[in-house]
Amino acid sequence: MSHLVALAAALGPDATLISDSDITASYSRDHAPFAVSAPPFAVLVAKNAQEISKALIFANENKIPVVTRGAGSGLSGGANSDAQSLVISLEKMNQILDLDVANQIARVQAGVINIDLDTAAKEHGLAYLPDPASREWSTLGGNAA
């Protein structure tokens, strides 16, 4: 059984697993002009932590390299895959789960865009101050990475 078929079975029918190389190529690199990359064998567009957990267990058991991807806005090559890689995209995990105004704490998913958190914070007289040039489309998960 191929890794793709086995991974799809492990994730279940509701998972978004992409294997078309014309599409996976767009998930294969960040904006580093010098870093080597190749389209991964598959991209999981994760919707929740359970899908990520299942994918990581599968990858670990099968010695498959994993690249986690936010928006691909980085300039270091850190989000670049090779042909044996599984890319886990966090683009759909983009919810602001809680804004605790009193304690100035936000609980967010990794795919939240910088500007979206800043906009939500401004509604309460607060701000999300990291201001990368890519703030219009870079994610908090990428900031943390």
Residues of each region from the PLM?
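Short glycine- and acidic-residue-rich catalytic loops of nucleotidyl-transferase/cyclase enzymes
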Residues: 69
